[in-house]
């Protein structure tokens, strides 16, 4: 169905071709096991992102980014060959296995055209997820096995294009995805090999469950909101300028002397978001709300994981408080709790306990039960795809737009870099937020107060 977006011309996207791109060199047939963190059922979701590239500044008769990217993908799979395989969760132990190599396999690569210019879509700034899906490859988790990676190139009338990526989170985290996408554009730009050599080594993050310890499942039966359940959800991208972040940090330091510790944007804005979300949802004040944080553990592993390790290398830390406490605590109080959670994540013994706990969750097929109204997770996407230049002839992407599963988006706030076209937003952040429509009104009031 045509979609009208910022133009009198309805948007129509025609997907012309999908082919299976295979590695440029022969890969022996093999079966690979994944780490405990990769096997976490909460990681078996498909994350997608749109990389928006403007047209070249000069006319070019050979304006075919899809040809360069298709060849680069084949070369990439010679290094990242597991991406060309197939994932399947085994019934026997509920672990994922990756089958790759041989004559089968490949990565779905789609070429599409759009009948409008990128400017009519404002380079996807504040685009809704349903529209963004037009520029993304189709990829789903399937109990019978599925491809973990797919790409789509959508060309626009202006000469610009969108590189759409879909990836199973079981294969990699944001760090790994960033390296993969930069390696792809490096190869498309003429480099002979990726700057960082990929390494599998998933056995380095495998836990050993202790039978006498019951598993901990986060976020069970949290505080209730009068606005949930609902089918009326909205997603907004909230802009927070550098001056607002600076003022909030200064106010936080006046509340509490953090001595030689640096307080980060993620910490102070995360604390402010939690307080704002609790108010917006009008959570039961005596009920528990849980803040979830993704904390990297690459350097906690002994020895540290090499740069080329692209599997999941983070653990989720949880800070539980009653809704009343979140409202009454100062920003500095919450920042202290966030810092404590991050310190715990960097403890080697804690990491082993977390791996053992996750192994039990997998084995027992446990999921979060009860209300999730008070569950609130933060994730930082500011460095997704930013591990080097992505310029392979069309300059750097002017915008990177994540598209996450709707069920996940309802409990997660994503930190994003502002669009490169917004010069007045240098040093600021954008927060992608999904809330019930009635709660979003109050949430935006709280965020406007920050400005």
Curated annotation (Swiss-Prot):
Keywords: Acyltransferase, Polyamine biosynthesis, Transferase. It holds the Pfam family Transferase. The active site is at 169 (proton acceptor), 391 (proton acceptor). It is an enzyme of class 2 (transferase). The keyword Acyltransferase applies. It comes from the Eukaryota. It catalyses: 2 (E)-sinapoyl-CoA + spermidine = N(1),N(8)-bis[(E)-sinapoyl]-spermidine + 2 CoA + 2 H(+). The keyword Transmembrane helix does not apply. GO terms for biological process: polyamine biosynthetic process; spermidine metabolic process. Signal peptide: none annotated. Monomer. This is Spermidine sinapoyl-CoA acyltransferase.
């Amino acid at each position: 169905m045509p979609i009208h977006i910022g133009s009198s011309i309805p948007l129509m996207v025609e997907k012309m071709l999908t082919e299976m791109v295979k590695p440029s060199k022969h890969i022996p047939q093999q079966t690979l096991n994944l780490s405990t963190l990769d096997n976490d059922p909460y990681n078996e979701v498909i994350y997608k992102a749109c990389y928006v590239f403007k047209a070249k500044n000069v006319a070019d008769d050979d304006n075919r980014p899809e040809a360069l990217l298709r060849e680069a993908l084949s070369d990439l799979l010679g290094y990242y060959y597991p991406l060309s395989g197939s994932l399947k969760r085994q019934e026997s132990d509920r672990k994922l296995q990756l089958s790759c190599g041989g004559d089968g396999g490949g990565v779905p690569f789609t070429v599409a055209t759009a009948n409008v210019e990128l400017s009519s879509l404002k380079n996807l700034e504040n685009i809704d997820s349903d529209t963004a899906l037009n520029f993304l490859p189709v990829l789903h988790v399937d109990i019978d096995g599925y491809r973990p990676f797919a790409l789509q190139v959508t060309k626009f009338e202006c000469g610009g294009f969108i590189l759409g990526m879909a990836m199973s989170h079981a294969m990699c985290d944001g760090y790994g995805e960033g390296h993969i996408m930069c390696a792809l554009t490096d190869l498309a730009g003429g480099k002979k090999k990726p700057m960082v050599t990929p390494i599998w080594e998933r056995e380095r993050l495998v836990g050993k469950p202790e039978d006498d310890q019951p598993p901990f499942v986060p976020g069970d039966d949290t505080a209730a909101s009068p606005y949930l359940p609902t089918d009326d959800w909205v997603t907004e991208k909230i802009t927070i300028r550098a001056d607002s972040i600076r003022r909030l940090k200064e106010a936080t330091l006046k509340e509490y002397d953090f001595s030689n510790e640096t307080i980060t944007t993620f910490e102070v804005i995360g604390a402010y978001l939690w307080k704002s979300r609790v108010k917006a949802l009008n959570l039961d004040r005596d009920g528990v709300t849980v803040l979830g944080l993704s904390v990297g553990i690459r350097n906690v592993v002994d020895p540290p994981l090499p740069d080329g390790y692209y599997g999941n290398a983070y653990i989720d830390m949880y800070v539980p408080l009653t809704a009343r406490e979140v409202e009454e605590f100062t920003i500095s109080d919450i920042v202290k709790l966030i810092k404590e959670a991050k310190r715990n994540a960097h403890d080697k013994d804690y990491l082993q306990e977390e791996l053992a706990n996750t192994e039990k969750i997998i084995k027992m097929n446990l999921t979060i039960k009860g209300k999730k109204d008070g569950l609130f997770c933060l994730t930082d996407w500011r460095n997704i795809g930013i591990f080097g230049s992505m310029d392979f002839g069309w300059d750097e992407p002017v915008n990177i737009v994540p598209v996450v599963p709707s069920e996940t988006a309802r409990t997660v706030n994503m930190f994003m870099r502002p669009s490169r076209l917004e010069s007045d937003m240098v040093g600021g952040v954008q927060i992608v937020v999904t809330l019930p429509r009635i709660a979003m009104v109050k949430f935006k009031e709280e965020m406007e107060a920050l400005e």
